[in-house]
Amino acid sequence: LLRELNQNILLPSCQQFVKDYLDTICHLYSDEEVWYRFSELTNAEANSLDGTKEYFDERHPLFGYRGIRRLLACPDEFQAETNVVTEVFQTNLNLSVIFPFVNDAEQLKQAITVLRQYDFTGKVGTMIELPSAYFDLDRILETGISKIIVGMNDLTSFVFATVRNSQWHDMESPIMLDMLRQMQDKARMKKIDFAVAGYLNTSFIQKMNQMGIECILH
C-alpha cells in the first residue's frame, strides 16, 4: 500500500488510505480473518517515500532495515501504523496483524509489547523469512502468536545465498521441503496456523497441497 501511494505512514493522507482500505476489506470479508502485514519495505524504498524522516545508508537492498527491524528503529512510524490498525480493529474484530522480516523470538516479543501498549488486542502472527527465525522457531512459537507464514522467496534466497530467478534459488529442493515439514509439525503441535507465501510456481503449489500447507500467492 505504501509503495502504491509512495508515501510514508507518517503522513495523514497515507494513514487515511490504509484505514479506508482495511475497512473495506474487513467489511467485504466480515466472516473471515483478515491478516494485515506491517510495512515491509527495503531501505531504498523507504528512503524514497514522501514523508520519510528516518534515512539509513545501506548498500544491499535485501538486508538491513526491513520489516520489524525498521518498525523498532523508527518508533514514530511503528506508532502511526499501529494506530491505524487499532482504529480499524475497533469496528472490525476480524482484523489481525503479522510482522515481517523477524530475526528471532526476542525481537518479535519487543514488537508485540509495543503493539499491545497501543491497545491492539487482536491476533498476531509472524513471517518466517530468515534462517535465524527458523532456528529460533521453538521460542517464537511461545510468544503468543496465532499464525506463521513462511516467506518462501526470501527464505530460499538467504538459505542458498542467492537471488530469485537464479539457478540456485530452488524452493522445491529437499532442504527447503524438510525445513517446511519441520516448521509445519512444530506449528501443528502448538495449534498455530501455518502457511507459505511468495511467487510460487504450479509444481511447488502441488507439493504444498500434498503436504496440506496453505499457499498465499503474490
Predicted stretch roles:
Residues L1-H218:
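Conserved alpha/beta-domain cores
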